[in-house]
Structures are given as structure tokens and as C-alpha cells.
Amino acid sequence: MNKKYDAIVIGGGHAGLEAAFAISHKGRNTLLLTFNSKKLGMMPCNPSIGGPAKGIITREIDALGGMQGLWADLATIQLKMLNLSKGPAVRALRAQIDKEKYSQLAYEYVLKQPNLELLEGVAEEVIVDENGYFKGVLVENIGLIEAKVCVITTGTYMNSRILRGQDITTSGPDNEKTTPKLSASLAKLGFTLQRLKTGTPPRIYSDSINFDEVEQEVLSDVNISFSSRSNLKKPKQIACYLTYTTPETHRIIEENIHRSPMYSGVIEGIGPRYCPSVEDKIVKFPDKERHQIFFEPETADGAITHVNGLSTSMPIDVQELMIKSIPGLRNAKVQKWAYAIEYDALDPLQLKESLETKLVHNLFTAGQINGTSGYEEAAAQGLIAGINAALKLEDKDPIVILRNHGYIGVLIDDLVTKGTKEPYRMLTSRAEYRLLLRNDNADDRLSEYAYNSGMISKEEYQKVLDKYKLIDDEIQRLNTTYLSGKSDVALKYNITNGSTLLNVISRPDVDPSDIIPNFPYLEEITTMVRLHGYIEKQKSDANKAVRLENLKIPEDLNYLDVKNIAIEARQKFEKIRPATIGQASRISGINPADIQMLMFHLESRNKKNYDQN
């Protein structure tokens, strides 16, 4: 095999796949190193893509030229648009995925991808040269493989262990391998590691479930997709089911809580706040009589059911009692028991906005190693890290997505500016400009980034420009066209003469298809018209913030020279080393006075340099 590459990507999960495809797409010779080539893009937790905010991230990945949206569309077995009764800012797609098909698609695409080589192996050590640049990776039973750049995407596999009660196994998810030596290697290089935890529920053989005892979910009528490249018809919808925990479930958990590693002190890692274990729910919400449990098929044949909402680290004998206490599962046969998994992750404050590490040049990290949870968050980071690794090879500036341009920008900015001590999950509430970051306009927001970084072609970019020109032209036409008071539409909605079509379509009681029945982008134009004032207000606010993003802070700035700032501010500036005034202002504990003094210092420094020149 070749032992020299332009790039090495460690890990074949959602982050690693996006990174490998991005770098190889840009013509760089890339090695994707993974434990098991037949388990690329695994879904060890819930078999779904999308959801609030997360579905918009997948749309953004597609707009940037990534793969997750396309594969999700091809493997979808149920699709719904969430929050339809709410505003456009929080609407998002969620797809139930055939997890085996998704993994198979990833494998097939990897084999067909030019400039991309797949290798099974265990990364043991990151090698750095005397100047602090990444040099290569030591691989078990193979030796040193050299490359110019590297993206580490180890997920939950780094120095991981699985816990069920007192039964503790050193392994990755689903009894895969783990990488304790790689974790030790990063610590030796000076990286600060933290211990995190997540969990997964049991899987049940579907033919042992009594579906008559549970509620079938109402299927949505959605004809939309994550990817602009899939051109799929609406998938055949496969139902999920809803049931609940019972007082008996709660009694079993309460009586055995001392046997949960979460509460016996065995687990050191911090778990995800927004995806708690079932024992966590019972302990933290003792007054709640029941908790939702969803039965979700893992594949199109529906043979195995994922019991969403029953994540636990209880021992197997307790799990069995819990499962039998839930309606529909009285006679359940378990295919896989639930478990908690603990793993090493980096403190993301050690990263630049490009996701390159501050300690080692040309070394990038992405996904759960950076302290996030979720397939979508991982894929987004992998894509950005991959693009920026390739741009580094071209000696070009990295792409940094602004907070008003994408949830991906919010995600990365939060990580590298604020850090996280628990698995970070993207929420709509984290985005201050969420009305701008809608499900319907990801291509408008991000296609320029994709084109400028070489991820989409000129033709693809022009297609997006043409789409929004068509929308703008139609808005102009609507604004200059008046509705006859005698028309069917006017009579239907009791509209008098003198109203423009734009005014008519802006009314929430009007069906826009009555006004422009054949317009191809009905959702986009309706949202833009009806929320025009609110959108313009958020754009104005965002533009003010962007001015601070344009005020760069030199990498070599000595913060000891900055006078009249708080000691806490000086320490945080020194640790995080923000790239811009905007980023500096978002650091926790930094007050406006500190920012003013920092700006004053930079102005004085720039004036002094100008005078000297």
C-alpha cells in the first residue's frame, strides 16, 4: 500500500466521511482509516437524520456540497416536516433511516470516489515534526503513514468503555474496537482531554411486540427532501409507534437506582443534557407520571425496533424488568441490550474557527471528539474540517461560516469560543438569527461558500443564483400587479380593488397557490413576503454584528500589553485567542468594557505600525 498521502482521515463515521469526501473532491490523495469498512456511517443510537435545527444542518451540509443529505434521502423510510404549526424559523425535516442501507450507500460511494482510498486499521499515535507540524499516523501492524494534513474523527471510540450496571467492557459502540493509545498520544502532545458519556436504548425483535397495545403515529404527507441532488419521489412511509412508561417502570428504576453506573459513581463522564437516560428522567422529574417511548424501525424490513426514550445503563436483569413493564413489550425479545458509553474528547477551546488545532499545525478534529452529540453536528464539522484541510494544502484562507449564515456557523463558533463540558446538541434557541437560518433557504445562504471553496461547480452555483433571481423577479411582478375586485380570488377572500398581488399573498389567510399556482418555489416566496419586515430587521442586526467580525485580532497579540482589562478577560483572551473582535465579545465572562479596551489597543497598535511604515 501507499504510505504517503496528501491527507489522512481517522474514523469512518459521519464526520470522517464528510471530511474524506471534501478533501478527495478537491483532488487531494486521501486515506480514510477506519476499524471496519463495512460499518461506515454507523448509527449506533437512533436511526434517524434531522429534527429541530438538526434537519436544517443537514440541508446546509447539502448546500455546501456534502453527502449526508443525499444518503439520508436514499435511505429514508419515513419523512416528516416538524413544527408545521409554528413559524418557518423552527420548521425542519426529520427522516427515519434504514441504517443498514445508509451504511451500505456510504461504502459504495467511498469505493467510487476518485482520490479516496479506504483502509482498515487502528490509529495509535499522531506524529508531529520538530516544528509542530503534523507528519503522520502510526497504525497498528502497519507502521507510519505520512500525510500533509490530518482530520481526526474518532467519535465515541477514543479510550471508550461500555457500561451496564457493574458490567464494564473496554470497547467502542456495538463491541467495536477502541483507541486508548491515540488518546494517550494526544495527551502527550499537550491536548487537554475531557471525559464524556452518552447512551443508547435496547433493540427489540419487532415480531415480539404487541402493536395493538400502542398508538400508531400519524404519517405525514411530505414531498420534500434533504438534498437538491436526490430528485426522489416521496418515500413509502413506514410507521413509528408511541407508548409510555408506567408506574411499575418507575418503581423498578427507583428500587434499583443504586445499580445504575450513573448514580453509583462508576461513570465519570458528563452525559448529554437534552438526551437523558430513562433513570435520569425518573430521578429529575419524580412528579411526572409517565414518559414517552417511541418504537422506531431500524431498517425497511422492520425486523428490529429501536426503543427511543429507554436509554439506560442499568444491568441486564433490571433492563428486562423495565422492558416487560411497558405496554407493547410484555413478551418482548431483546436483540441488543441498552448501554452507556464513556469516551475521551478534546476541549474544543483548543481549536481555531477552521477546526484546525492550535497546538499542532495541519491537524484538524471534527465530530464527537470536539464535544458534540448527533450525526448532523458531526457531519457538519467533518465537512468544514475537510474543506479547510484541503484549503490549507492550497495555501488558501479557511472558510468560516458566520452565525447569521448557518447553524453550522453557530455550532463551530459556540465550540471554539465558549467550549463545552457536556455533549453539545444544536438547538434553534442557540441561534440569535434563526429567522434567517430557515429550512427553505440553506442554498441561498451557503452556495457562495461552497462555490468559492471549490465544493460545487459554476453550473451548480448558477442554478442557485437563477432560482433566487426568479423569486426576486416574481416578487417585483407581484408588487406591480393589481387584483381585480371581480376575480374569483378577490371574491373568495373578500378583497376590494386596489390591492397588489404582493399585499394579497402577504395575508396569512390567503392560500398562496391561489395567487401563483404554478410557481416552483412557493414556500420560499411566501415566507419571504409574509415575514419581510422581521427578516429585514434580523438582517440589519446581523450586519451590525458582522462589522465586529471584520475587525481581526493578530494571532501574535500579547494580551499583557492590553491595558485596563479585567484579569479574567486577559486570561480568557490568552487561552481562547479569538480571531476577531466579534468572537472575543462572545466569550463567557467578557464585558463590553474589556472589548472597548481591546479595540482601543488594536487601534493604537495599528496607528503605531502605520506611522513606522
From Swiss-Prot:
The keyword Membrane does not apply. FAD binds at residues 11-16. GO terms for molecular function: flavin adenine dinucleotide binding. Keywords: Cytoplasm, FAD, Flavoprotein, NAD, tRNA processing. One of its GO terms (biological process) is tRNA wobble uridine modification. NAD(+) binds at residues 271-285. It is found in: Cytoplasm. One of its GO terms (cellular component) is cytosol. InterPro entries: FAD/NAD-bd_sf (IPR036188), GIDA_C_N (IPR049312), MnmG (IPR004416), MnmG-rel (IPR002218), MnmG-rel_CS (IPR020595), MnmG_C (IPR026904), MnmG_C_subdom (IPR047001), MnmG_C_subdom_sf (IPR044920). Its cofactor is FAD. Its main location: cytoplasm. Homodimer. Heterotetramer of two MnmE and two MnmG subunits. NAD-binding protein involved in the addition of a carboxymethylaminomethyl (cmnm) group at the wobble position (U34) of certain tRNAs, forming tRNA-cmnm(5)s(2)U34. Belongs to the MnmG family. This is tRNA uridine 5-carboxymethylaminomethyl modification enzyme MnmG. It comes from Mycoplasmopsis agalactiae (strain NCTC 10123 / CIP 59.7 / PG2) (Mycoplasma agalactiae). The gene is mnmG.
